């Protein structure tokens, strides 16, 4: 499990990376099964494609 932002950034500091988020943790026992794509470019700045604000507010994501 990776925290959004904290552990994704180091992979993107020197090069562009595409990360597939498989599962977003939602509330107690309910999970939203969705595939998201994050494109990260340079210095920890990310460009995000296909992710809603609601998904970004979740605490953890699983990266495949």
Which stretches of residues belong to each language-model region?
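Short beta-strand-centered aromatic/proline hotspots
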Residues: 16-27
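Intrinsically disordered, low-complexity, charged/polar segments
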Residues: 37-64
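Short, solvent-exposed secondary-structure boundary/capping segments
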Residues: 29-38
């Amino acid at each position: 499990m990776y925290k959004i932002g904290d552990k994704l950034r180091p992979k993107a500091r020197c090069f562009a990376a595409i990360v597939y988020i498989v599962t977003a943790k939602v509330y107690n026992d309910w999970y939203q099964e969705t595939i998201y794509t994050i494109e990260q470019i340079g210095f920890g700045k990310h460009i995000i494609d296909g992710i809603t604000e609601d998904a970004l507010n979740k605490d953890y994501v699983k990266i495949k």
